[in-house]
Amino acid sequence: MGSGISSESKESAKRSKELEKKLQEDAERDARTVKLLLLGAGESGKSTIVKQMKIIHKNGYSKQECMEFKAVVYSNTLQSILAIVKAMTTLGIDYVNPRSREDQQLLLSMANTLEDGDMTPQLAEIIKRLWGDPGIQACFERASEYQLNDSAAYYLNDLDRLTAPGYVPNEQDVLHSRVKTTGIIETQFSFKDLNFRMFDVGGQRSERKKWIHCFEGVTCIIFCAALSAYDMVLVEDEEVNRMHESLHLFNSICNHKYFATTSIVLFLNKKDLFQEKVTKVHLSICFPEYTGPNTFEDAGNYIKNQFLDLNLKKEDKEIYSHMTCATDTQNVKFVFDAVTDIIIKENLKDCGLF
């Protein structure tokens, strides 16, 4: 009888030890789990950052996965040329080449013929000819006056490669592709002995109400803002400047009670497009009070300070900022490495080890 009790208590002690070990393992795993929330207005580059995480931390895109983007690449290319053609009328710009008017009619009649994600050689030739028209180029230069994908020139300048037989999208083609994010997309990966759970949330106004579900237990927020959007308006409200919307959104996030103890990193994205644009369009179009030089450094720093000045708790909370180009893998790799070090440092601070 006594031996029965003894073996029972041994069994119970063993179970207790196993449970203790499991709880310890769970606690360690939780301590190493980083919940990253990607926030920002629509078309600020959040989804491109997620794609970069797959390239940098998850062995990239297989040939099969790249092939799945072929239809998106063609759709983005077609939507871009259609947007420019439509804007020709709105902005009152004339074609230069005599054939372009006829090509426009052909394009509009063939616009629904992207069957099985392929582009016919005839459609490709029409798009190529139109893109080569100086009138279209003049209209493209005024892209901030209508809605046009950032990737328009990237694809339209490379139509020969994109429409060659046997074309398979490469990683740059995938990074430049644009599909509106609806809902919440989670990506998991490991880096520097941490397990990351990254959440990409749709940025358009209609999507933002879904963010609330992600707020609990967030380690770090990466807020993306497009530097190049200073002379553009929202897709969903053409009365609102995109940069002003981004600042308004950042203000509500960085000063939100939910995020009082959350690390916040600001990605001032699309620095490549900004560098190109700032030589042509003065920053005062967005910030009338700005009288400084219209250089990448001066205008870029001014925008950065507009965001950082919104932080009402500067003495308690530091906001880290980086200028980024989300389509540049090396740049994102370097910046994300720095972000991870910030997360590690903040975690050690929380544990009293820093």
UniProtKB/Swiss-Prot annotation:
- A Gene Ontology BP annotation from the UniProt entry: detection of light stimulus involved in visual perception
The effect of G352P is: Loss of activation by both bitter and sweet compounds due to disruption of interaction with taste receptors
Q: Which residues bind Mg(2+)?
A: S47, T181
Ranges annotated as biased composition (Basic and acidic residues): 8-27
Q: Where is this region: Disordered?
A: 1-27
- Annotated region G1 motif: where? 35-48
Q: What else is known?
A: Transgenic expression of GNAT3 restores responsiveness of GNAT3 deficient mice to both bitter and sweet compounds, whereas expression of mutated Gly-352 transgene do not. Furthermore, in wild-type mice, this mutated transgene acts as a dominant-negative by inhibition of endogenous GNAT3 interactions with taste receptors.
What is the protein name for this chain?
Answer: Guanine nucleotide-binding protein G(t) subunit alpha-3
**What is the organism of origin for this protein?**
Rattus norvegicus (Rat)
